[in-house]
Amino acid sequence: MKKIKVKAYAKINLSLDVLGKREDGYHEISTIMQSIDLADILEFEKSEIVKVFCNDHRVPLGEDNLIVKVINLLKEKYQMEEGVLVKLDKRIPLAAGLAGGSADAAATIVALDKLWNLNMSKEEKKEIALKVGADVPFCLEGGTKLAKGIGEIFEDLKITSMNLLLVKPDIEISTKEIYDKWDRLNFKSHHATVPVVQAIQEGNIYKIAENIKNDLELVTSQKYGIINKIKEELLKKGALGCAMSGSGPTVYGIFDDLEKLRKAYEDLKEVYSFVFFSKTIDKGLELYE
């Protein structure tokens, strides 16, 4: 096998409770992570050198890039001499709260396992994933998961398919900055995860939409009023409920009426540079060989 293509799917958070800061600097959370059908496309090809190409010039391709981090970790762990050429077709917006970088890292773990014949176990993949970032273990599996710890302890959930509209304003958010501000201002959690889990188990889209909340929204919307403006617009246009994903700034709305969703899409794409009509899916990655 010389070449592998992977679709790396984005995620949203249907809830995000921040429960405290750990000694290692990470935050203890309780969150429901959900894969959606927005995806980056990555192509991996055997080579003597390591080189990453991307269609978006804003993506940094140095040692801090998560794809590069995974390549270096795997080369070191398995004493690999050969390299890889990676072509990244970036479709998930940057610094958006949608785990685009984490999805690309997960795709790299799975692709190189096959391309380099590493025969990694599920645990070995997860171990590498955790070294790279807190969302990467989820992106390896995808679907709908209740995640605890720093986001690496999972419980599978089964969700009714939902139609979504994603809107990202023209701002980029630093996750670290948002968590630091959360700590400084001593915010208290909404504890939204339990009611959303119950609604998912009941298969009740209306209850899910009614209960979605994200603690980090308190911080991000305080600095960027546009978050609340987008939420108001989505609700006015027929969303059953809406929330920010991750540390933001992407906001999503859940719709049960496709006509209203299409109309909202047409209206909002005139105002915002990134508006995406999406749906929930049950996987994090898709491989093409």
From Swiss-Prot:
<dbReference type="GO" id="GO:0016114">
    <property type="term" value="P:terpenoid biosynthetic process"/>
</dbReference>
<dbReference type="Pfam" id="PF00288">
    <property type="entry name" value="GHMP_kinases_N"/>
</dbReference>
<keyword id="KW-0808">Transferase</keyword>
<dbReference type="GO" id="GO:0050515">
    <property type="term" value="F:4-(cytidine 5'-diphospho)-2-C-methyl-D-erythritol kinase activity"/>
</dbReference>
<feature type="active site">
    <location>
        <position position="135"/>
    </location>
</feature>
<comment type="function">
    <text>Catalyzes the phosphorylation of the position 2 hydroxy group of 4-diphosphocytidyl-2C-methyl-D-erythritol.</text>
</comment>
<keyword id="KW-0547">Nucleotide-binding</keyword>
<feature type="binding site">
    <location>
        <begin position="93"/>
        <end position="103"/>
    </location>
    <ligand>
        <name>ATP</name>
    </ligand>
</feature>
<feature type="active site">
    <location>
        <position position="11"/>
    </location>
</feature>
<keyword id="KW-0418">Kinase</keyword>
<dbReference type="InterPro" id="IPR020568">
    <property type="entry name" value="Ribosomal_Su5_D2-typ_SF"/>
</dbReference>
<dbReference type="InterPro" id="IPR006204">
    <property type="entry name" value="GHMP_kinase_N_dom"/>
</dbReference>
<dbReference type="InterPro" id="IPR014721">
    <property type="entry name" value="Ribsml_uS5_D2-typ_fold_subgr"/>
</dbReference>
<dbReference type="InterPro" id="IPR036554">
    <property type="entry name" value="GHMP_kinase_C_sf"/>
</dbReference>
<dbReference type="Pfam" id="PF08544">
    <property type="entry name" value="GHMP_kinases_C"/>
</dbReference>
<keyword id="KW-0414">Isoprene biosynthesis</keyword>
<keyword id="KW-0067">ATP-binding</keyword>
<dbReference type="GO" id="GO:0019288">
    <property type="term" value="P:isopentenyl diphosphate biosynthetic process, methylerythritol 4-phosphate pathway"/>
</dbReference>
<dbReference type="GO" id="GO:0005524">
    <property type="term" value="F:ATP binding"/>
</dbReference>
<dbReference type="InterPro" id="IPR013750">
    <property type="entry name" value="GHMP_kinase_C_dom"/>
</dbReference>
<protein>
    <recommendedName>
        <fullName>4-diphosphocytidyl-2-C-methyl-D-erythritol kinase</fullName>
        <ecNumber>2.7.1.148</ecNumber>
    </recommendedName>
</protein>
<dbReference type="InterPro" id="IPR004424">
    <property type="entry name" value="IspE"/>
</dbReference>
<comment type="similarity">
    <text>Belongs to the GHMP kinase family. IspE subfamily.</text>
</comment>
<comment type="pathway">
    <text>Isoprenoid biosynthesis; isopentenyl diphosphate biosynthesis via DXP pathway; isopentenyl diphosphate from 1-deoxy-D-xylulose 5-phosphate: step 3/6.</text>
</comment>
